[in-house]
């Protein structure tokens, strides 16, 4: 992430919400779904779970946001793969942020993967940079599980696993 590009995009303004859905660092492009009952044990190659660029990638976009885009008391939301929680939390801590809680998107259907169980949820860290707690956005306290439908296959934009708009609308 280029800080100069972020600066140009923000044009001197600062956002009170830092809501992101960065790459999950798994080798999935929407075309490599597993086939039912196929033995995939030999197909977990070197790259399917390669996170070697992960911390650098996450640190880069976080640093650009802090330097050029968000207010001191911005609320942070970051969707991520469960597999990357420790790495993401370490990146947040390096930037002075902490994970206040986790939001779970409960999908209306499971996603066929090579895992032992169908993924029917996605986690999202919610937090901020200490000591700058952001104000609550809702008058009432919302649950930490958000039940939202997934996009139908023919409704998806140019991304294999898009988030529903409410995943970003609720924090707004």
Residue ranges and their predicted role:
Residues 1-172:
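Core catalytic lobe of class I
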């Amino acid at each position: 992430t280029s800080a100069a590009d972020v600066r140009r995009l923000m044009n001197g303004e600062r956002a009170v919400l830092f809501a992101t859905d960065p790459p999950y660092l798994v080798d999935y492009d929407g075309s490599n779904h597993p086939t039912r009952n196929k033995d995939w044990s030999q197909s977990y190659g070197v790259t399917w779970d390669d996170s070697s660029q992960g911390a650098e990638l996450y640190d880069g976009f976080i640093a650009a946001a802090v330097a050029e885009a968000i207010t001191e008391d911005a609320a942070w939301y970051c969707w991520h793969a469960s597999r990357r929680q420790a790495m993401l939390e370490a990146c947040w801590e390096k930037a002075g942020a902490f994970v206040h809680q986790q939001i779970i998107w409960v999908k209306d259907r499971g996603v066929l993967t090579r895992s032992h169980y169908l993924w029917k949820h996605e986690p999202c860290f919610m937090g901020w940079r200490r000591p700058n707690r952001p104000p609550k956005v809702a008058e009432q306290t919302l649950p930490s599980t958000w039940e939202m439908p997934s996009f139908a296959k023919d409704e998806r934009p140019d991304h294999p696993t898009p988030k529903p708009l409410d995943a970003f609308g609720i924090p707004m």
